[in-house]
């Protein structure tokens, strides 16, 4: 019986009356899903700008940015307003210097700075040409309970462009200082930090205020390769929209002795910045 293949149209000798294809290859091709043909004239074009404005009207604010004062750092990322940013790194890497450069970039805007480490140098502020009228400093207490109230009041006031908490690892709780050295107060700082974030998160959003939390990197004891962790629990990593890790890559020194200077005098160091979490741009970039 001669029949025509339903796939290729070739005439073939059918052994059965129900045969439709001339070969197994034609049967497989005919059973494969066919691509959907889209009419270019009828295809709907996604209007990005129009839909963006609709989402903003729903109550989702567009991200506004604050410069870090360092062009190379701004090319990686800036600091988002109305959100929480954590800057972490080892000692001496330049976390505080980065925060002070952010303040210098704001110029006439007000900043609330919490110096829980009590290590801020006024000469450095003058070198960066910061205005005392716009720089509100809090270093009256290192207790987390007092610092939390100060952050809460600053966030609710809405008069600050940025609140800088330098640093979370350096603050303590009253239970830690009033007890004995051998007392173990586990999880108190993490509990207070979790509660603080819940209290200020919506105020930061509504007032478009950036909260920058500086944190230290520490190592766990034990094992061949110690794990890196940041004090204060997991509340900040979960709530932060941006997390930046700073790492020293190379120290820069004078190659030769200058007139009246010591040989190989320290000049600075190279810092590598890495985005380890981001809800506002692409993460895991350096």
Show where each model-derived region lies.
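Phosphate-binding/switch loop-helix module in NTP-utilizing enzymes
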Residues: 140-209
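Phosphate-binding/switch region of NTP-binding enzymes
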Residues: 186-286
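Flexible glycine-/small-residue-rich
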Residues: 89, 115, 167-169, 248, ...
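BZIP DNA-binding basic region
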Residues: 1-35
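The Walker A/P-loop phosphate-binding site
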Residues: 41-136, 152-156
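Catalytic P-loop NTPase motifs of RecA-like helicase/translocase cores
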Residues: 120, 171-172, 220
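Residue-level preference for the first positions of well-ordered beta-strands
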Residues: 84-86, 110, 161-164, 210
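C-terminal regions of RecA-like/P-loop NTPase motor modules
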Residues: 34-60, 64-66, 71, 122, ...
């Amino acid at each position: 019986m001669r029949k025509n293949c339903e796939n290729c149209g070739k005439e073939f000798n059918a052994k059965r009356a129900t045969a439709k294809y001339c070969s197994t290859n034609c049967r497989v091709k005919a059973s494969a899903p066919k691509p959907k043909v889209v009419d270019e004239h009828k295809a709907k074009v996604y209007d990005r700008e129009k839909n963006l404005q609709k989402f903003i009207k729903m109550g989702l604010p567009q991200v506004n940015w604050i410069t870090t004062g360092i062009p190379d750092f701004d090319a990686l990322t800036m600091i988002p307003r109305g959100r929480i940013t954590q800057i972490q790194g080892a000692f001496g890497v330049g976390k505080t210097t980065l925060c002070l450069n952010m303040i210098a970039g704001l110029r006439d805007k007000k900043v609330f700075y919490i110096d829980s480490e009590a290590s801020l140098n006024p000469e450095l502020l003058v070198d960066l040409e910061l205005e005392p009228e716009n720089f509100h400093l809090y270093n009256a207490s290192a207790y987390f309970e007092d610092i939390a109230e100060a952050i809460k009041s600053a966030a609710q006031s809405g008069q600050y462009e940025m609140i800088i908490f330098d640093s979370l690892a350096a603050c303590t709780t009253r239970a830690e200082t009033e007890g004995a050295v051998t007392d173990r107060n586990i999880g108190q700082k993490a509990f207070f930090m979790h509660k603080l974030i819940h209290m200020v998160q919506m105020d930061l959003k509504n007032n478009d205020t950036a909260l920058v939390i500086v944190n230290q990197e520490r190592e766990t004891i034990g094992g061949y390769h110690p794990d890196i962790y940041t004090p204060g629990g997991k509340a900040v990593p979960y709530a932060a929209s941006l997390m930046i890790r700073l790492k020293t890559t190379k120290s820069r020194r004078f190659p030769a002795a200058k007139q009246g200077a010591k040989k190989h005098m320290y000049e600075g160091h190279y810092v590598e910045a890495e985005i380890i979490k981001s809800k506002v741009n692409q993460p895991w970039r350096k």
